[in-house]
Amino acid sequence: MATMTRKEYAAMYGPTTGDAVRLGDTSLLAEVEFDHSVPGDECLHGGGKTLRDGMGLMPGHDSVDGALDMLICNALIIDPVIGIVKGDIGIKDGKIVAIGKAGNPQIMDGVHPQLICGVATTVRDAEGLIVTPGGIDVHVHFDSAQLCDHALAAGLTTLIGGSLGPITVGIDCGGEWNVGKMLQAAEAWPINFGFLGRGNSSKPESLLGQLRGGCLGLKIHEDWGAMPAVIDTCLKVADEYDFQVQLHTDTLNESGFLEDTLAAIGDRTIHMYHTEGAGGGHAPDIISVAGKSNCIPSSTNPTNPYTVNTFDEHLDMIMVCHHLNPDVPEDVAFAESRVRPQTIAAEDILHDTGAISILGSDSQGMGRINEVICRTWQLASKMKDQRGRLPEETTALGDNERIKRYIAKYTINAARVFGIDSYIGSLEPGKLADLVLWRPAFFGIKPELVVKGGFIVHAVMGDSAASLYTCEPLVMRPQWGAFGEAKQALSVNFVNRLAVEADTATRLGLKKQLLPAFGTRTLRKSDMLHNDACPDIRVDPQTFDVYADGERLHCEPVSEVPLAQRYMLR
C-alpha cells in the first residue's frame, strides 16, 4: 500500500486531524479536530486530478438532480458553531447545503448525499487554505460610501449601523425617507446591510415609521439624549415589534447614572454599544454591564488590543467625532472623562474570558472598518501571550477554544444579537453562502477570496493584461459577482417585519431581497456562543480600577502587535 508522510499529505490535500496551523504571524495555533476526507478519495481539480467525469464527477448528475453549484474542497474550516474541521463545502442556490465528503458516490467512499458533484459543479480547491464565515460588523457609521469597498476587501460581508454620509455626527438612518435612500444606495454592493433608525423618542408613535421604512432596529445615542424615558419607550416598542435596541449611554451622567439606566432597562434584552466606555457611555462604570444577563455587550476596535498608543490617539478622535471644541474646557473634560487606561486594559481581559461577546468597528466614528477582523486576532494573540493558553483547551497544542471564542465575536454572536442568525453567522447548512478564504500566512488581515451568496465577489487578482491571473501586482479586486444585477441577487437587506408587511421593497423599487429579523426579545447573555460569562464587575470610582468577581483586571499595553506592519504599509 502506498503511504505518504504527514508533510506530503498536507502539501497535497491540506492539514488533517491532529495537524496545527499558525494563524498569520500571531501566537495562535488552529488544530484540526476532525477530517471529513476519505484517504484516497479526496477531491482535487486540474490536470490528472480526481474531479473528472466518471471519477469525482458523477456522469449525468445535473443541477436538477441536486448537483452542487459550487464546491470548495479540502478546506480547513474555522467556524464558531461547527468548530475547526477539515472538509468539503457544498453550495447550492446561493446557500450552504452541507460540509463533509464530496464527490461521486458511484466510485468514492463516504460521499455525503448532498455533496454529489456533476458537470454543473464549479470547483475552488482550498487545500492549504482556511475558510471562515463572512464577517459581520455590528457597529458601522456609514459616513463614507467607500467604506463598503474596504469592508469587502477585509472579509466583511454584512454591515449593520447608521448614518447618511458626512453629516455633522453620523449616528443613525433616522426617518422613513432617509432609510429608503440608504436601501436604494445599498443596491450598489454585494453586501448584506442592516440600517439602524433613531430610537431617541419618548413617544412610541414616532418610531414605527422608521421600521416600516426599512430599519432593522433602533439606536439610542447620547448625542440625541439617552434619557431613561427614551430607553423605556424604545424597549416597549421593541418588545411589541421584535427588534434589537442598541444603547450608547450618557457619558456625562446628565440624565442619570448607570443605575438609573439599568433601572429603565429592567430585565429587558438590550444591545450595549461601547461596553468599555472610551467610545461613550456612563463614566467610569459602564463596563460593569458586561456582567448583566440581559445586556448583550459589544465593544469596538479602537481600544482593542490595548497598546502604548491607545490613550493618546483617543482624545483627538473623540473631539472630532462628537463635534467638540478644543477651546471649550467642558468639551475637553467630556473627552478626557472617556479615556481610562484601567477600563481599556480590563476590556482586553473581559473579551478573553468571554464576558464581552461581540466586537465591531465603530467605523469612522473612531474605529476602522477594515480592522474588525485583524484587531480581533491581534487581541486574541496578545491575550495568549500575556495570559497563556486557556485552561479549557482540549487539543494537544491548539488554541481552538480561544479561536472559537474570538471568531464568534464577529460572526454568530453578531448575527444572533440582531435576530438574523438563521440567515448568516456560521457555515451551517441552509445559511447564505457568505464565506472567506484565507492563506494561513495572511489569515485575519488579507483574504484570498470572498464568496457572497455562493459566488465570488472579491479576490486577490493579478494584472488582467497578463498571461495568468497570478501575475503581479496582486491586488484585492472586485470580481464578476460585484457587477451588474448579480450584486443584488447575491446579497440581502435585513429589516424589521413591518417593512416586509408594508412591501417596502416594491415601493422603493429594490432588487435586493428584504429578510425580517426575529427572536431578539428573548435573547440573553447565555445565547452568546463561547462568550456568555457574567462576572460581577465593579469599578472603583476613585482609581477606575476594574474588578471581576473580586479580582482586579489588569494587563500591560503592548508596543508591537501581529498582523500589522509586516503586512501593511501604514
Curated annotation (Swiss-Prot):
Pathway connected to this protein: Nitrogen metabolism; urea degradation; CO(2) and NH(3) from urea (urease route): step 1/1
Keywords: Cytoplasm, Hydrolase, Metal-binding, Nickel
Residues passing through the membrane, by range: none
Superkingdom field: Bacteria
Binding site for Ni(2+) 1: H139, H141, K219, D362
GO molecular function: nickel cation binding; urease activity
Modification after translation: Carboxylation allows a single lysine to coordinate two nickel ions.
Subcellular location: Cytoplasm
The Urease domain, residue ranges: 134-570
A GO biological-process term: urea catabolic process
Any one GO cellular component localisation term in the record: cytoplasm
Active site (record annotation): H322 (proton donor)
EC number(s) given by UniProt: 3.5.1.5
Binding site for Ni(2+) 2: K219, H248, H274
Chain residues that bind substrate: H221
Catalysed reaction, written as an equation: urea + 2 H2O + H(+) = hydrogencarbonate + 2 NH4(+)
Database matches in InterPro entries: Amidohydro-rel, Metal-dep_hydrolase_composite, Metal_Hydrolase, Urease_alpha_N_dom, Urease_alpha_subunit, Urease_AS, Urease_asu, Urease_asu_c
SUPFAM superfamilies in the cross-refs: Composite domain of metallo-dependent hydrolases, Metallo-dependent hydrolases
Keyword hit for rRNA-binding: no
Residue numbers bearing the N6-carboxylysine modification: K219
Required co-factors: Ni cation
Family: Belongs to the metallo-dependent hydrolases superfamily. Urease alpha subunit family.
Subunit structure: May form a heterohexamer of 3 UreC (alpha) and 3 UreAB (gamma/beta) subunits. May also form a heterotrimer of UreA (gamma), UreB (beta) and UreC (alpha) subunits. Three heterotrimers associate to form the active enzyme.
Record HAMAP family: Urease_alpha
Protein name (database record): Urease subunit alpha 1
Native species: Pseudomonas syringae pv. syringae (strain B728a)
Name of the gene: ureC1
